[in-house]
């Protein structure tokens, strides 16, 4: 009896210890996590040169972290981020890259140390109180020749209804976790390695990440399906008052497309109306969808007709939406694949206590931007309606982008931070 009791106690103790080890391992997480974000950007605006290095980004000189996050540039961008569990303050690391990147044998990863700017500058003046925005937001959606019944959806800033604002700005987007530039993580590009990603760069091939505390097995292969997407080439035809036909190049490895346009016009009482339109079959302000989405999320959105299928190559912005707008900007995003790698590889039926030694994720997108209605005016010039056909079209100064506020910033202005 005593032996049986002793065995039972020993078994219970061992089970408890094993459970504690599992819980501890789960709390620790992988020894290293690596994220890579790839982005291809293109801008098609009359007056802006089609070539010229890095496009809009090239005007700033050099390469800086965060290039894959925004829009409005031209060319390829890549951001990487490394987290090492044993060194939460960050480590100096190396990312060995394939020759097809045309950027040398490796990239340098440096710990991110955010600058504490608070208190660095003394100001005597009292901060001005932010002025409450005025006017309305008009929301349209759907491809087609005509505006659909029940549109637009209108939000009046004068009401300042929290519930209405929250409902109006809700979106179908749910970006997957990737590069964020977190403190203590090691990043590329950085102040010591700011090479630009060339237009002919390819991520295909073997990659290896090393550094203090990084497992020597952190190596992975990138195939063609997880390489940079081609650039979005937008072509528009027609004026906003008649409807604008938009065409683009379909992409082999794209999972779906989403278009979003915005403009501004004078509304009632002289206040400014902001006008939003998206290619979705359901109302969506579009802001959260203009970023990386996981393939599973994109598949759901295609099924819900929020995102256009990858075989789609055209869409018409209905007539009359932007006919009174003081310039309208059209943005498009092509969602790419997502590569998720771990070591050891995740089993099909992984137990609850399964824990990889390291993980790596590569996200891919391609974005394009153009001005609605400007393509027609350029064709008019070439056809002789604006000037003689034999007369060369002079390069105009770059067209300024319409100053349309971000809804998130508007919400902060209305309800505070």
Segments the model singles out, each with a brief description of its role:
Residues 1-9:
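Bacterial N-terminal signal peptides that target proteins for export
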Residues 28-191:
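Solvent-exposed N-terminal domain segments of exported/luminal and surface proteins
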């Amino acid at each position: 009896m005593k032996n049986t009791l002793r065995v039972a106690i020993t078994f219970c103790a061992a089970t408890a210890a094993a459970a504690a080890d599992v819980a501890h391992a789960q709390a620790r997480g992988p020894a290293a996590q690596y994220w890579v974000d790839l982005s291809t950007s293109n801008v098609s605006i009359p007056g802006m040169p089609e070539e010229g290095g890095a496009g809009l980004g090239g005007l700033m000189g050099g390469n800086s972290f965060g290039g894959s996050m925004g829009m409005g540039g031209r060319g390829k961008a890549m951001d990487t981020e490394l987290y090492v569990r044993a060194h939460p303050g960050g480590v100096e690391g190396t990312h060995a890259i394939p020759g097809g990147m045309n950027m040398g044998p490796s990239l340098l990863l440096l710990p991110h140390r955010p600058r504490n700017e608070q208190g660095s500058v003394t100001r005597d003046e009292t901060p001005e109180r932010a002025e409450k925005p005025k006017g309305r937001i008009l929301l349209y959606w759907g491809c087609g020749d005509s505006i659909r019944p029940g549109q637009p959806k209108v939000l009046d800033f004068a009401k300042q209804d929290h519930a209405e604002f929250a409902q109006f700005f809700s979106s179908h987007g749910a970006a997957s976790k990737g590069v964020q530039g977190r403190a203590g993580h090691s990043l590329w590009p950085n102040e010591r390695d700011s090479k630009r990603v060339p237009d002919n760069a390819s991520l295909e091939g073997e990659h290896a990440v090393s550094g203090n505390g990084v497992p020597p097995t952190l190596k992975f292969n990138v195939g063609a399906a997880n390489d940079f997407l081609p650039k979005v080439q937008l072509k528009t035809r027609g004026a906003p008052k008649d409807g604008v036909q938009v065409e683009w190049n379909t992409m082999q490895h794209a999972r779906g497309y989403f278009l979003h346009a915005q403009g501004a016009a004078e509304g009632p009482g002289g206040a400014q109306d902001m006008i939003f339109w998206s290619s979705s079959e359901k109302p969506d302000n579009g802001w959260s969808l203009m970023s990386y989405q996981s393939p599973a999320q994109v598949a759901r959105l295609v099924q819900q007709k929020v995102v256009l299928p990858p075989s789609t190559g055209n869409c018409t912005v209905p007539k009359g939406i932007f006919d009174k707008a003081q310039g309208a900007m059209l943005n498009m995003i092509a969602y790419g694949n997502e590569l998720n790698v771990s070591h050891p590889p995740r089993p099909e039926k992984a137990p609850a206590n399964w824990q990889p030694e390291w993980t790596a994720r590569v996200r891919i997108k391609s974005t394009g931007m153009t001005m609605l209605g400007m393509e027609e005016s350029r064709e008019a010039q070439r056809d002789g309606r604006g000037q003689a056909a034999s007369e060369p079209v002079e390069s105009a100064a770059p067209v300024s982008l319409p100053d349309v506020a971000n809804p998130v910033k508007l919400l902060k202005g209305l309800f505070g931070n």
